[in-house]
Amino acid sequence: MASSSTWGLLLLAGLCCLVPISLAEGLQGHAVQETDVPRHDHEQHQEAACHRIAPNLADFAFSLYRQVARQSNTSNIFLSPVTIARAFAMLSLGTKGATHAEILEGLQFNLTEKAEAEIHEGFQHLLHTLNQPDNQLQLTTGNGLFIDEKAKLVPKFLEDVKNLYHSEAFSINFRDTEEAKKCINDYVEKGSQGKIVDLVDELDKDTVFALVNYIFFKGKWEKPFEVEQTTEEDFHVDEETTVKVPMMNRLGMFDLHHCDKLSSWVLLMDYVATATAFFILPDQGKLHQLEDMLTKEIRAKFLEKRYPSSANLHLPKLTISGTYDLKSLLGNLGITKVFSDEADLSGVTEEQPLKLSKALHRAVLTIDEKGTEATGATILEAIPMSIPPNVKFNKPFLFLIYDTKTKAVLFMGKVMNPTQK
């Protein structure tokens, strides 16, 4: 039987397609098995497992971002590094030999220093921690495994993706490509709360299985902006281009300082609960320098030592998205064999050799006065008598959203033009 396999990352949503090497290049499926999230008695052990893989995931996040930036000098960037890493780590469970090593090393794991079991345990606890219910912060992740009704996958692979990556499994008829596409897109749309639609626009009828994975985030600022203070202001895309954007304004106390090393203003804004947004505004002509210099060590220093100061802050409201073909991006990080005829995915199915034909990632972000969810709040702050500086994010800037509990970079991006969707 011809085989192929698909996989997606979402709201970060993405899609990876596995095809036979012999080839040129609500849900309506039936649940095969429901996965129970493992119950852990020791929260401290969970966090420790997450934290052990956090440095590697951070290195991967910044390396991947730089690859995207090199291909995208004038466009907005938005992606979820942790979602991409999770998807490929999950796929690695079905790979062997050089294909296997390339994926984990491309995700910045040194297999001589960190046992593979420790890596997967870290992801297992990361997913469990991120999916803990919180009244103030909506952060949910999910994995869907869509299996062709005639396919015979390796039982251990099925067991591992369910137990370690909390994947749900569904039986599906991939020969009916339109119905299969609808099932996968419905799963993605539902999981992303309608933010990601029509992720899959075409599907190979020889597909054997699809791994779809998503993360959805809704957060409220600890210190929201007043809607009444939002005004239309200029945003300077480049020396020749200026656009009008709705600019949020607030006079108050912020974790804000000018970092001479990065030649940038650095703003940290906390969401209610465990997430923090970093906004980094480079000085004129220093954008590329900032992109090259930003590392996990610098990010950690910003968290360790905050600089509360008064300012009149101007931050644009925006909705941006990014769609990426990961084949070339990950190829530059050393992940190549899984996309080639040399791929060894015999841990997925032994029926016919497979390779990864497509890997797509799509992400969407909205920033507004309340965060990403409307809610009322009143902030009273004492402001120093001295005249506070005006800090305007009215030219290209970088940002990332970081989960303080798991120490994971959830999202990362660059705003070149807020009017560019």
Curated annotation (Swiss-Prot):
**Keywords recorded for this protein, A-Z:** Glycoprotein, Phosphoprotein, Protease inhibitor, Secreted, Serine protease inhibitor, Signal
Phosphoserine sites (modified residues): 386
Site keyed Reactive bond: positions: 385-386
- Single GO cellular component term: extracellular space
Q: Which SUPFAM superfamilies match?
A: Serpins
Source taxon at top rank: Eukaryota
Q: Which InterPro entries match?
A: Serpin_CS, Serpin_dom, Serpin_fam, Serpin_sf, Serpin_sf_1, Serpin_sf_2
**MF terms in GO:** serine-type endopeptidase inhibitor activity
Q: Where is this region: RCL?
A: 376-395
Determine if Phosphoprotein is one of this entry's keywords: yes
Localization recorded for this chain is:
Secreted
Q: Which residues form the signal peptide?
A: 1-24
Q: What is recorded about the domains?
A: The reactive center loop (RCL) extends out from the body of the protein and directs binding to the target protease. The protease cleaves the serpin at the reactive site within the RCL, establishing a covalent linkage between the carboxyl group of the serpin reactive site and the serine hydroxyl of the protease. The resulting inactive serpin-protease complex is highly stable.
Q: What's this protein's function?
A: Inhibitor of serine proteases. Its primary target is elastase, but it also has a moderate affinity for plasmin and thrombin.
UniProt subunit comment: Interacts with CELA2A. Interacts with ERGIC3 and LMAN1/ERGIC53. Interacts with PRSS1/Trypsin.
Name-wise, this protein is Alpha-1-antitrypsin
* Species assigned in the record: Sus scrofa
Gene name tied to this protein: SERPINA1
